[in-house]
Each structure stands twice: as C-alpha cells, then as structure tokens.
Amino acid sequence: MAELYYDNQADLNRLKNKPIAIIGFGSQGHAHARNLADSGLDVRVGLYPGSKSWAKVEAAGLKVMTVAEAAREAQIVMILTPDIGQADLYREHIAPAMEPGKTLMFAHGFNIRFGQIIPPQGIDVSMVAPKAPGHRVREVFVQGGGVPALIAVEQDATGGAFEDALAYAKGLGCTRAGVLRTTFAEETETDLFGEQVVLCGGVSALVKAAFETLVEAGYQPEVAYFECMHELKLIVDLFYQGGLNYMRYSVSDTAEWGDYTAGPKIITDQTRAAMRQILADIQSGAFAEDWIDENHNGRPRFNAYRQADINHPIEQIGRELRRMMPFVNPREVKPGEGGA
C-alpha cells in the first residue's frame, strides 16, 4: 500500500532556520518560492545574471541573486530548471556550495536516476514533486488548499532528510491534500512512461492517425478535427473528475458500447508489447542516453520532428477552427518557441 502523509504529520518548524534557495522561476519555481515564503520560510531565488525573470522575482517581493550566491546562502537548494541543463548548472554553480549537512532537492528525478548529477555523500538528496502545474500549485494554495505531491529520499546523510522533505511539502500546501512516498527511480520511470505512452506520445499519435484515417476516407478535415481532437477535452475532463466509470456514465450508451468493442482493437497485444519495450528502454537508461546525446548534438531529430508536426494538416485546420471559438482561449506557438 502507498504511504500517505498529511498536515498533522509534517513539522514546518524544521525549516524555520534553514534558508531555502529556489533555482529557477518558471512555472514550478514561481509557485514554490511564493508558497514557501507565504508559509513563513526564508526563501531566495537563484537566477542567471540578466535573466528575464529577475524583475518578476523582485516584483513578487522575493530576494533574488545569482545561482551560486543562492546556493552558498542556503541550507536547502531546490533545482527547478529544465532537466537538460541541470547537470551543467549543478557542476558550475551549485556543487561548490554543497557542504556536508546541506540538502539538494528536485521536483523530478531524471538527473539523479540517470547519473547526470552525482551529489557528494555528506548531503541529503530528496524530492518533492507536486502533481500539478505551477500555476495550479499556487492557485490552490492561495485558496487554502493544496495539490497532492510525491516525496522521495535518495540520500539521507543527516538522518532527517525525509522529515525535511515532508516539511517542505507542507510549506507548498501539498500535505493539505496528501503526499505519497515514492523513490527517485519510481517517479522518474513512471513519469517518462506516462509521457511517452499516454500523455504526449500515445495521445498525439492516436489523434493524428484517427484524423488521417477519416480524411483519407473522404471526410472533411474540419469534421475530422472536431471528432478526433477537439472533443478529446470533453472526455479527459470526465476522466479527471471521476475516472473511466464517470466518463461512461456521462456518454451515450452507443459511445459506451463502441468503447468496449473497438478499444481492444486499437490496443492490441502488439501495442502492449511496444509499451513494455518503451518501459524497458526507460529503465535501462537507453531513452535518457538517446535524449542526452540528441541535446549534445544540437537536437537535429528533435527539431525535425517538431517542424513536421507543426506542418501536419491537423494543426493547420486546428488553427483555423480555433479562431471560431474564442471561448477555448486559443493559443498559438510562434516559430522557434518551445517548452522546457
């Protein structure tokens, strides 16, 4: 059974005299810094000199300094920058300040799990990973609630790594909802698997393949877009609220019957075998090695994949149709822009 922890099991006083450095001020960094500060903790934000976020930190009323300065001042250093780049950032600016007894924290285990960051033996290494985007972590906290989180300890040099991580989670508001204890390996491997097989890779490929099937059969691309992409949100929202059962309760009996009869034809034994191979590649480190090499080589395949999907007909049709629907709050990514 999962180990769950709540507010009454976490002691925020453990962190009252432990300065905290939040490295990065993106989605998660913004939420962590502001929530912890509002919880009465001593927070500073570490950024590169000249960072566009510098003024945002100052506007939020928080202390801001370089990454190296923040790491030197802090007892707890939470790295909240993108996975790729963390290792160099750590080696150049954080590692020199990681004296025995300090704590290095993460919100995702990629660089620890795959050996890109190897902390010294004398420090604690832990993880607090809220299961929501940063804006929601902040929004729910301000409303008096919290989002669930995962918590893990990779290295416990002081004997109090878990208790400090739990206190940190309380500072974020996460123990109001409940935090689940895991390991760096479990969090990293399941996170990558979910992204690749369902949330990003699986859903994107399914939507495109279904759209292409309808268009090739002579149906209007606009109708195919509505059926294969636009309406997906309606179903995902039902999943989010009440799981598969609530979705089936909410749709028509015809849709539910099609769910039962057609679904197994899409997810076949071959599909499940592919899922197992994807998981094996994650567990072995093959995926991480490929992704790290891709970045070292300038991302040629990554950029080609991205451009191909930008040019896919479903994207062209989608841009046109979303202009008809201002209520969906249409967002378009400019050329050259990308996520973390």
From Swiss-Prot:
Cofactor(s) it depends on: Mg(2+)
* InterPro entries reported for this sequence: 6-PGluconate_DH-like_C_sf, KARI, KARI_C, KARI_N, KARI_prok, NAD(P)-bd_dom_sf
| Assigned EC number | 1.1.1.86
Q: What does this protein do?
A: Involved in the biosynthesis of branched-chain amino acids (BCAA). Catalyzes an alkyl-migration followed by a ketol-acid reduction of (S)-2-acetolactate (S2AL) to yield (R)-2,3-dihydroxy-isovalerate. In the isomerase reaction, S2AL is rearranged via a Mg-dependent methyl migration to produce 3-hydroxy-3-methyl-2-ketobutyrate (HMKB). In the reductase reaction, this 2-ketoacid undergoes a metal-dependent reduction by NADPH to yield (R)-2,3-dihydroxy-isovalerate.
**Binding of Mg(2+) 1: at which residues?**
D191, E195
Start and end of every KARI N-terminal Rossmann domain?
A: 2-182
UniProt source species:
Chloroflexus aurantiacus (strain ATCC 29366 / DSM 635 / J-10-fl)
Species classification: Bacteria, Bacillati, Chloroflexota, Chloroflexia, Chloroflexales
Q: Which GO terms describe its cellular component?
A: cytosol
Similarity annotation: Belongs to the ketol-acid reductoisomerase family.
Q: Which reaction does it catalyse?
A: (2R)-2,3-dihydroxy-3-methylbutanoate + NADP(+) = (2S)-2-acetolactate + NADPH + H(+); (2R,3R)-2,3-dihydroxy-3-methylpentanoate + NADP(+) = (S)-2-ethyl-2-hydroxy-3-oxobutanoate + NADPH + H(+)
What's one Pfam family the UniProt record gives for this protein? KARI_N
Q: Binding residues for substrate, per the UniProt record?
A: S252
Any idea which positions bind Mg(2+) 2? D191, E227, E231
Q: Which protein, by its recorded name, is this?
A: Ketol-acid reductoisomerase (NADP(+))
Q: Which domain of life is it from?
A: Bacteria
Q: Tell me one GO molecular function of this protein.
A: ketol-acid reductoisomerase activity
